[in-house]
């Protein structure tokens, strides 16, 4: 970030930002209108992950999964945080905790399991853009 130093004044023009995150219902309208398929709903391609076992090339996403035992926030290996997240096959915006979950009663909650390109596609459809 060469333009961040030395400290200097910057003028930013006016802009609009939505009052809340995009909800499941709003994202659902976009998907229904366009037929869009999110990154989490698409299985990884073998050519993008050479040597990966075929059983690992399944659509899904990483889900916050608190461990049953106490885990330090930091450890010597620097990997303690990895115990809080798990790749769940079938997890997507439609199934936020995995294939057995759904959006029942979650229409007003923020959509999850959305990749950057998914957010860009939604913003373009909604006549908006992502903040930079």
Predicted region positions:
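Extended beta-strand/loop cores of jelly-roll/beta-sandwich
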Residues: 1-131
